[in-house]
Regions:
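Short, charged/polar micro-motifs that form catalytic or ligand-binding hotspots
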Residues: 113, 170, 190-198, 235, ...
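Amphipathic protein-protein interaction modules
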Residues: 92, 195-248
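Secretory pathway targeting signatures of secreted, lumenal, and periplasmic proteins
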Residues: 2-55, 59
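A recognition module on extended beta-rich or small alphabeta surfaces enriched in W/G with H and D/E
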Residues: 229-277
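Short secondary-structure junctions
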Residues: 16-23, 61-73, 214-217
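Surface-exposed amphipathic alpha-helical segments
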Residues: 16-18, 105-138
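Signature of long, low-cysteine stretches enriched in small and polar/charged residues
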Residues: 56-104, 110-113
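N-terminal low-complexity, intrinsically disordered segments
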Residues: 137-195
Length: 277
């Protein structure tokens, strides 16, 4: 599975069954939630110095007596490891300091003592620096922790607002489309209130996920734009529910969510028909 860091500094590939999980700020954590075999973490740092990456490797080799120079794929690294005990179980943490140009990476892989670190080395081999100013094609990747947080925040605001204004429950089912529409049509929100309209779009998107099997949240990276969207069974059917609502409101066009739901459902059914043929 491909991962592109927020801001587009780097990309990497991680195993299909692995997922990204919330971690400390500026650190990205990946592991298999169903069959845990270790935690892989990566942090990236950028500096104005063009040889910053090499400086970091040299510094690690100088200051850490247990570090040694190794090659992982095309990457020069300073590698070290340590073994520790936690709650009666022994673990080993492997560390790599990697650098190139003005970027430095710190990677770690913590797993039970005696475990195989090759999966972490494969991830490091896949690591690529995305060049500043280079035009990359639009990519769709599994939804990142960043966008999950944005979706949750937007949905929480929209659902709370709808329940407060209508004094009705909101369970993210098809029947709730009318409630979103009622609040959108109430005149309480002005076209320039982008956050509100996009949040209503996210709430609509949540209904699409709940009502259409195979519809899932993804992250779209398109140049400098990075946003949550919906993709149907890995097909070309891609929906940006936040933009769907806000762009219509901004252009003073009618936004009928029931009609949009029916349209998207037809398109999803057409995708399934194509897959069967």
């Amino acid at each position: 599975m491909k991962y592109i860091s927020p801001g587009g500094w780097f990309s990497l590939e991680y195993p299909v069954l692995w997922r990204e999980f919330e971690d400390a700020e500026e650190s990205f954590l990946f592991y298999d939630p169903d069959n845990w075999s270790g935690n892989f973490r990566i942090s990236a740092y950028k500096d104005e110095a063009k040889d910053y990456g090499k400086q970091c490797i040299d510094f690690e080799l100088k200051e850490n007596s247990s570090a040694s120079p190794v090659k992982v794929g095309s990457w020069d690294c300073a590698y070290s490891s340590e073994t520790f005990q936690e709650e009666g179980t022994w673990y080993t943490s492997h560390f790599w300091v990697i650098g190139k140009g003005n970027l430095s990476f710190e990677c770690s892989f913590t797993l039970p003592k005696g475990g195989d670190k090759s999966v972490a080395e494969e991830i490091i081999r896949s690591l690529e620096i995305r060049e500043d100013g280079k035009n990359y094609p639009k990519e769709i990747i599994p939804i990142r922790i960043l966008e999950i947080g944005e979706v949750n925040t937007a949905f929480e605001w929209a659902s709370t607002t709808i329940k407060k204004l209508l004094t009705k429950d909101f369970t993210s089912q098809e029947e709730d489309i009318e409630k979103i529409q009622e609040v959108m049509d109430s005149g309480r929100f002005q076209p320039q209130q982008r956050m509100a309209w996009e949040s209503f779009g996210i709430a609509f998107g949540t209904i699409l996920v709940n009502e259409m099997e195979g519809m899932e949240w993804v992250t779209v990276v398109d140049g400098s734009k990075e946003y949550a969207a919906l993709q149907f069974v890995g097909s070309d059917l891609l929906i940006d529910p936040a933009a769907l609502v806000f762009e219509k409101v901004k252009k003073k066009l009618p936004c009928e969510l029931k009609a949009e739901f029916r349209r998207i459902k037809r398109e999803a059914e057409a995708v399934l028909d194509d897959l069967k043929n």
